[in-house]
Amino acid sequence: MSRAHAAYANEGWSAPEGGIAGKDGSTRDCSGYGSQGPLFSAEEEVKGTVVRETVGPIEIFRYADATDRVLMIAGTAFAVACGAGMPVFSFIFGRIAMDLMSGVGSAEEKAAKTSLIMVYVGIAMLIACAGHVMCWTVAACRQVARIRLLFFRAVLRQDIGWHDEHSPGALTARMTGDTRVIQNGINDKLSQGIMNGSMGVIGYIAGFVFSWELTLMMIGMMPFIIVMAAIIGSIVSKITESSRKYFAKAGSLATEVMENIRTVQAFGREDYELERFTKAVLYAQGRGIRKELASNLSAAVIMALMYVSYTVAFFFGSYLVEWGRRDMADIISTFLAVLMGSFGLGFVAPSRTAFTESRAAAYEIFKAIDRVPPVDIDAGGVPVPGFKESIEFRNVRFAYPTRPGMILFRDLSLKIKCGQKVAFSGASGCGKSSVIGLIQRFYDPIGGAVLVDGVRMRELCLREWRDQIGIVSQEPNLFAGTMMENVRMGKPNATDEEVVEACRQANIHDTIMALPDRYDTPVGPVGSLLSGGQKQRIAIARALVKRPPILLLDEATSALDRKSEMEVQAALDQLIQRGGTTVVVIAHRLATIRDMDRIYYVKHDGAEGSRITESGTFDELLELDGEFAAVAKMQGVLAGDAKSGASVRDAKKASGHLGVILDEADLAQLDEDVPRTARQNVPIDELAKWEVKHAKVGFLRLMRMNKDKAWAVALGILSSVVIGSARPASSIVMGHMLRVLGEYSATKDVEALRSGTNLYAPLFIVFAVANFSGWILHGFYGYAGEHLTTKIRVLLFRQIMRQDINFFDIPGRDAGTLAGMLSGDCEAVHQLWGPSIGLKVQTMCIIASGLVVGFIYQWKLALVALACMPLMIGCSLTRRLMINGYTKSREGDTDDTIVTEALSNVRTVTSLNMKEDCVEAFQAALREEAPRSVRKGIIAGGIYGITQFIFYGVYALCFWYGSKLIDKGEAEFKDVMIASMSILFGAQNAGEAGAFATKLADAEASAKRVFSVIDRVPDVDIEQAGNKDLGEGCDIEYRNVQFIYSARPKQVVLASVNMRFGDATSNGLIGQTGCGKSTVIQMLARFYERRSGLISVNGRDLSSLDIAEWRRNISIVLQEPNLFSGTVRENIRYAREGATDEEVEEAARLAHIHHEIIKWTDGYDTEVGYKGRALSGGQKQRIAIARGLLRRPRLLLLDEATSALDSVTEAKVQEGIEAFQAKYKVTTVSIAHRLTTIRHCDQIILLDSGCIIEQGSHEELMALGGEYKTRYDLYMSALS
């Protein structure tokens, strides 16, 4: 059985050897990394691991401030003092044991004094143990928060070229996963290691004081232990970093999928993406298992050598007593001191492993923090008080860093004067947007120079230069927050009045005021709750509120209908005409650049790169009658300024209102007519927390999920039983050995001494073998746990992809938070399985076997100890419950959301100089979390200290009561020693269980967050079987369809819509931005479910159809084309797995992109970059169109599919789409703001405020003389 089986156990999936099978029975090969190319480089595959450095043991604390250093110093002092407790105890124990064996005086009187000293030691341990946990936990929280902040700041500081090579998903995985590893290595786990290490050192020092000869003999094995620890530590470090790197790739993949979830679902690629993700996490799983086995091998060797040393110690100790060199008290004190010291050193291993892992995890993070980018926003430079003269490109040679062999500009020279209005025109992919990028200094040219006011841009203060620039990009990026907050990002200190005025100019004010919450309306993650046009107008308002000296407009109005475009263009013209504003425009609609002072026509000549072939005013270029004039004629744009104020006034008159707002009575009536579920009644802002609260997580559930690895858990439990039972059992041998030594002190019987030593000392070899075997088997916990982690990660990822789009609109369910779940939370759940079972079983065995031994040898003493156990266990449980109370507050992960959103929109963050704003928001989220972390550390430390005090108190009580029994003749010294030591081990392990409470509490909170998603059944469920008989053709009808977004429950987006899309017909949807056009398309893709009414396909209710089958018959091209990291070929083939190269190329020809692709150096194997960053907007859109056409669907949905294209290219693409439709008899539904695009549709539907106001063919609507005719005439007047 392959490892992939584990990922689907008990969840309705099977994974036969060599592949992953979905519910449909189809099997996919898992030998590679899907079709997206190899997961790792050939060099990495050959090596079998990723060799990586670690930071130094001191360097990892480089970001500690004075407070942290004081806390760490104090915590270290407390830890050392805590470690001294057991050696001090060994001295007291040896003295009182000698006194009791001597038979002189009252045993009870002597024990009372010793017990009182033990209580004093317990008080000291309370302070010391609480202190070291508190100090190190708080210091770690503070440092990791600072590291996260610095890493985030450093990542945002990096140049765009660096970001082109580092996906946001991988960076987010480092932020969430690796920083947790760092914290786990430098928190109280490290102080536990210091405590255990000091116990070892002080124990050995005490041993040398009591008997240097015996101590030397006992520590003879130490060189072997040290060498073994060093070797294993190095191996674990390399394996850990390898695992981290592999999962960083998996995290990047997952983030990209979640950000492009509409594309994934529309093309039914959930199984494919699950396969890719599974492949990636299986790599990480393999390394994780190796790490667990290596760590347990280290522990096995160390513990075995320790027990071997006990055999040697008792043999040699007996001779020292016989020779009169030492008495029994010295031997007992030495043995216990070195014994506890050895145990202390043995317990250093987990802390050492965690510390090593943290140093490995810190390496890449610190490397990023230290990196000084070549284009550095934080660097100084020549001040830029304003823009006065010009921007000059002087012999610029440029290639993108990700494609250094593909020269874009070989010798670009041009000058943009201050106050000048300049436009760039040309076919898609010719380099227009690259000019915009160079002006913002996203990149530096590889030759020549860009000068500002005669100064090289490299020498300017970059931050001040970007402050001079306002930009609206082709694909506007918004941020989670309100309308007001997003507009104000353009000018953080803008007043409300300035924001409102900017929104008026951008023609979005009336839309905002029609919403229930107005300017406080949330836009959703990356603006997901807004239409494309609304997002673009918000982005325009964001640029306008800044009133910048330089305004860059990269297809700023491409997503707007003609009315909105004219209104916004008028506002932009007013801004331009105020004077002093330098404007650089990229626009494919030549009518919008008619008034430019200068227009540059750019042409791309394949391998020769791009160059300016024509330049001049609009009229001059028409007179030139070159390539620009040919495009202008194609668009119907004539010389002269035909745009009039009347046109703009007509546009304003034609504007409709947006939205139908429901009052409480309407909502109540709607809920009565169409009942809502309990989940749907929860406010969307509270929904994530509500789902976490109702999540059910239990140990039995985890056991069922991992039942195929029950054998490994059984071996692990066997190891816990062996290890747990060995400790109390060894106390029997020790007790008998001490009796032999004590009797010799009284009788001087050498023969009895020899025979007793020969009988009992070799028994420690048995314990050595048992412990070695036990710790080796203990590694199977890690084996099972790693498999469980992989299963949960795969299951969570699968369930995330299963959710409907409504899920991703919920606050706290964005890609960043979900990526954090896949990384950190799933890893934390591991603790509930392997380590949790091991600790519980081991603790139970130690306590149970200790009590059994105690009852056998002295039942009265065992009863006293048993009566004290609830106190210790209760204290540990209290600590765990209190910590758990603070971990619940982690739900939400605001910091993860901020990180993912900022990194996904890094170009916008860079353009708007928002780095410090994002850092401040992230810092505020960290600051909000800090008090909870500190309180958790203080509580954890306090209760841990109390636990240790109770341990010493219980032992003092047992010791005093045992002496009382000796005085009464009811017990022998041997019985008291055996019972006391066996109970001591049980009590000590109970304390260790308490120390583990923090991690378990965190793991439980993580598990609830994870299972709140795993258990969620979406309203539109792809796994719900439906009718697979779709009928013939594709005839669609909407009957009284009403739709409301859950994020805006009072706003009706579609109000009782009735329409029909006939089979094999072409249908166009037009209307003002935000009127519901995209909603119609997204409902057809089953992204959202209607609120009421009926949508039918060939007479069948769409909601009754099998979703997977339905989506196999549709294809969609969204307004913002979502591409994936990989090659051009892979992205086109994404729509239809198994398509031949010929079919891919044919689809590319229809989308008019084939001839461009074959001119690229790597052709169809050209990497497109994260989200297609390596391509222009038009190139991305055409590849997305090719992908859609390759599917050969019954229904083709086009949402502004050609908005980023120039008119020449658009016309050719439109020809390809029409030819495709005619050939395959496809039903098409198109949204377009360019009315010429849909003029030839069989049916055109005009929507306004969620209602249909007109519908019919172009000729019918023109004859009607209504709203459509007004809009069409307005559109054509702008082109004439």
Swiss-Prot record:
InterPro entries: AAA+_ATPase (IPR003593), ABC1_TM_dom (IPR011527), ABC1_TM_sf (IPR036640), ABC_transporter-like_ATP-bd (IPR003439), ABC_transporter-like_CS (IPR017871), P-loop_NTPase (IPR027417), Type_1_exporter (IPR039421)
GO biological process, one term: oligopeptide export from mitochondrion
Residues in the Cytoplasmic compartment per record: 1-72, 346-712
Membrane topology: Multi-pass membrane protein
Enzyme Commission identifier(s): 7.6.2.2
Gene Ontology CC terms: mitochondrial inner membrane
Superkingdom of origin organism: Eukaryota
Stretches that traverse the bilayer: 73-93, 120-140, 189-209, 216-236, 297-317, 326-345, 713-733, 762-781, 837-857, 858-878, 938-958, 976-996
List of residues binding ATP 2: 1071-1078
UniProt key word Thylakoid: no
Alphabetized Pfam families for the sequence: ABC_membrane (PF00664), ABC_tran (PF00005)
Residues covered by the ABC transmembrane type-1 domain: 72-357, 713-1002
One Gene Ontology molecular-function label: ABC-type xenobiotic transporter activity
Chief location category: membrane
Enzymatic reactions: ATP + H2O + xenobioticSide 1 = ADP + phosphate + xenobioticSide 2
Compartmental location: Membrane
Span of domain ABC transporter: 391-634, 1036-1274
Residues given in the record as ATP 1 binding sites: 426-433
Keywords: Antibiotic resistance, ATP-binding, Glycoprotein, Membrane, Nucleotide-binding, Repeat, Translocase, Transmembrane, Transmembrane helix, Transport
Glycosites: 1113
Record's function text: Energy-dependent efflux pump responsible for decreased drug accumulation in multi-drug-resistant cells. Confers vinblastine resistance.
The family this protein is said to belong to: Belongs to the ABC transporter superfamily. ABCB family. Multidrug resistance exporter (TC 3.A.1.201) subfamily.
Protein name, as recorded: Multidrug resistance protein 1
Species whose genome carries this gene: Leishmania enriettii
Gene: MDR1
